[in-house]
Amino acid sequence: MPSNLKTNFLTRHPLMAVFLFTFICLLPAMLMRDFTPSNELRYLSIADEAIANGNIFAFYNHGLPYADKPPLYLWIVALCKLFFGQHSVLALSIFSLIPAFVIVWLMDKWVMSDASSSDRMAMAMMLITSVMFLGTAVVLRMDMLMCMFIVLALFTFWRMYELRLDGEPEGEDAVVYRKCSWLLPIWIFLALFTKGPVGLLVPPVSIAVFLLVKRKPRDIARYLGWKTWGVIAGLCAVWFIGVFLDGGVSYLDNLLFKQTVGRAVNAFTHSKPFWFYAVAILWCIAPYTLLLIGSLILSVWPRRKNAEAGSISAEAVKSDKEMLFLCVIASTFVMLSSFSSKLPVYLVPMFPFIVYLFPMAVNRCGCRRWAAWAIGVPAAIFALVGIVACLVLFGVINVEPLDATWKEYPFAFDPPIKIAAVLLTAGNLLALWFLVRRKVWNLPVFLVGSSLLLTVYAASGVLAKVNPYFGYREICKEVPMGTDVATLCLHRPENIDVYVGRQIKDYGKDVEAFMKTASDTTNTRPMSLITTYKCLEENPQLRDLLYSSGPVASVGPYCVGTIEKHKK
């Protein structure tokens, strides 16, 4: 009976099973990990400042305008702080993970409605465990939320397009069409309101390119006409008025011109060459790179003619849906490559369409021998990596060049890491076995993805020991109350006010400037210094000053000591 129930659950709710499994595997990491200094702490600090100052549309980071991002995600961060009373990694991670699940659900509904449960589970696992998609689903960024709205917009357009295939929609179809005609601009605006111009551009450009390819240029105005742009413009007007009232003309100018035109044309940050994404995408969709690039090539391969009839073979005729996916991928890739500012995470809106193009191409052309190799190669690499890791972790072989690394990170030999290595090895060996014996693609893909999630789940057991190496929460707990706080030789420490509850002074790597401040007796307030042991080793004078002032607390590679000042 339990076996039947299990089978029925997987058959009737394949996506729910994948979502539940993914959530369980990622839950320990979401519960225990620290915030990263580069972006996550900055969003928290901005939200704290907005709450303190009562800002709604204009945001500031330590008093400086922060017009880099629209307000929607920062509202979420602020509301979570107000609701829970503190910043929670778990609560904020949910706003990345749930949009990821919504995207998978939409793509499954769009493409896999007639597929088997095993194929649906494999495709869901493939998208979820693609490197960049998985990373974006657990980090605290607005990219996954924007991607969800982009997919919703394009899915809504597709419904409208299907309803018009046989002419003007009538009856219930007309009601659905009218609803979609309102939803389309709302989804586009929400994508814009989440991340910025990319959210505004991807859906309309993709729609326009698709209709041009289908030789229906006049239909562009049907979907992207006055109504669509009027709704978007009206919502933007409300937003911009709020920005003007909250931040003034200078903030509005910063939002509309410096952050938009500046990043697109002559980026002041993240500037990369035109070909950057052609390389980045190869690792962003790993471990399914060979499979997905292969299906992309298969999909765009020139049409073949029937030698006898002189006509185009049936397998060469792409469906409108497949053509739309290709247009989304191509137009988004070219558009993003033309922008000056580039980061791998900006590619996230393409990934659902790259992944779910695979079943359409395979169903049309057949699953050929290359697909088995495309799955088997990464599975074999993971299995080999897992075997080597097990041999090292269990002491079977000794790698002398890594001895210094093991001493610095002793938790690498903890049981959770060993279990993670075993799970990675076992999962991919099973994937290879099923690939050879059953000669199917779905189960091996599911096993490769599952092994990655189980590896993350097991390795999360050492997060408490890993946190001090990539976050500042633990070292900030050692900072005493009532002192000025200074930092030296730290990476992006400006937002640790989230932890210490007061503004800090960052000296970068300028040890001389800090020593001068420390010797100034005009300010008698004690000063706590957060720095690294490496910095102390390289600067004996600083080390002597800190250790002579009292006890020095250490957490991971960081240390904190308090310097007492006295008037002469």
Question: What function would you assign to each model-found segment?
Answer:
Residues 2-4, 182, 186, 299-568:
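Membrane-embedded architecture of ER/inner-membrane glycosylation machinery
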Residues 1-371, 439, 465, 549-557:
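Membrane-integral, polyisoprenol-dependent glycosyltransferases
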